[in-house]
Structures are given as structure tokens and as C-alpha cells.
Amino acid sequence: MKSILKTFKIILSIFMSAIILMSFGCSEKNSAGTEDNSLQKIKDAGKLVLGLDDTFAPMGFRDESGEIVGFDIDLAKEVASRIGVELEIKPIDWSSSILSLNKGDIDVLWNGVTINESRKAQINFSKPYLNNRLIIVKPKDRNDINSKEDLAGKVLGVQVGSNDEALQSDPISKEAKEIRKYDVNVNAFLDLRAKRIDAVIIDEVAAQYYISEEKVDFVVVENSPLTEEFYGIGFRKTDVELLTEVDRILDEMKADGTSAEISQKWFAKDIVLK
């Protein structure tokens, strides 16, 4: 009898251990988020929610009627259409853009987002789709600023985010008199026009568009970029399925000429990376 009870206890112990191990395995799988249905969630919702700074022309900004337009917006609309959903555009506070993405307030960050190491630690990126440089903009009459080295002792303006990070990592930041940070580039340009700062550090695509459209007496300091950058689309690290599909569609758009057409519309040339 004792032998039977002992055998029963052993079998019961093994059975219970197996159940516990199985439960741990299931829990780990769920908490790790290995079942990625991010693309299907977008399809079920019927929309792709894009987060942006709606002052970042020409990537995503408000036109005279208040509608949000831009190069990235046109790309995203086409991608959403090919997925089979609508595009919802959601302006966000760019200084907390990654938080908005990871909280689930938006599905993608798509607004001239610079790919850098600090962001890659928090989110995933699509393939780079655009090359960009961080450049210096000055008033046309400032003959004392002709190179990066001339920024020593000057008051500089920069938007909070990747541009701010890039400037801070450059040795010239330690030689500047002051670095003023702005939520949006437009406010930096307003201070430049009012001579409250000496130069603005900004993405080249945004600078060239602003100077052309606003007809301001600003110029780009030639042959003196602070960095070479790449733009990508930001995704939550769990949303690999959605990222893969967006990359596939963007490759498809490059191959069929759609990306080139959109680029011609906004930049008068095809600048999309092949």
C-alpha cells in the first residue's frame, strides 16, 4: 500500500510540475508579445494612425486652408491605401513622440524622423527612405558666419529632438555662447529674423523649403554640414509584421515610380533612396 501511495505521489508531483512549467511557458510567451498581429490590428481598425509635428514642412505641415499636407503625408496615404485602410493624421508633441508611439496613441512616427542610436534603443525603424544633412542657416547679411567653426561664441537655435542631440554631440556646441531649444523650427526662424539668435541648426530639406516658400533673407552656409542623416519610419519594437509590410510596399512604390512622382511634387527631383 505504501508503495502504491509513493508511486501515486511521484506521478502527481511530475504531473503538477508539468502543469506549472506549461503555465510559465504560456505566460512568458504572452508577456514577451511573440504573437505579432500588428498588421491585422491595423486592418481590423480600418486605419493607420500617423503621429507627426504638423509644422515640419515639407514633410508634414498645415497648408493655408489648415489641411495637413507634405511629402511624408503623400507617401503614407499611398502606403495606407495599399494596405487597404485609411490614414489618420494625429499631431503630437514631438518632444515626447516616442512615448506617444510606445503608449499606443499612434501606430507610426512618420515625419522626417532621423534614425539614430538613442531612438533605435527604444523603437524600430523602416529601411531609410531619404538622405538628409543637418545644416546651418544664417541671415544673408551675416558675413561673419561662413563655416561651422564660425559658430564659436554665437547664439544658436535648434529644435528639441534629434537635431538637438546631434548638435550637442558636436564639439562646436561647447564653443557656442548659448544654445536655445525650440519645440518647432518655425519659432527658431522667427527669433533668427528678430536677431535674437545668430543661426539655426536644422534639417536641410526643411531649411530649403522654408527659405523658398517664405521668401526670407536667410541662406544656408554652404559646404559646412554638421551631420549626414537618414530618415526612417518609427514603429513599436513589437510591431515587426507591420514594419515588414510597410517596407515591402515602399519598395513596391520605388519600383513602380510612385515614390519618384511624390518626390518630384515636393522637391522638383527624385531624392528617395533606392
Where are the predicted features?
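Periplasmic-binding protein-like
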Residues: 54, 131-138, 186, 208-251, ...
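Extracytoplasmic small-molecule ligand-binding "clamshell" domains
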Residues: 33-111
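Short helix-initiation/N-cap motifs at beta->coil->alpha
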Residues: 88-99, 143, 180-194
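Ligand-binding cleft/hinge of the Venus flytrap
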Residues: 76-85, 164-182, 211-215
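A ligand-binding cleft/hinge motif common to bilobed small-molecule-binding domains
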Residues: 96, 113-121, 169-170, 191-194, ...
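Short loop->beta-strand "edge-of-pocket" segments that line small-molecule binding or catalytic clefts
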Residues: 46-52, 148-164
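Short, low-complexity disordered leader/linker segments with a strong preference
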Residues: 1-45, 272-274
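Flexible hinge/capping segments at coil-to-helix
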Residues: 41, 126, 139-156
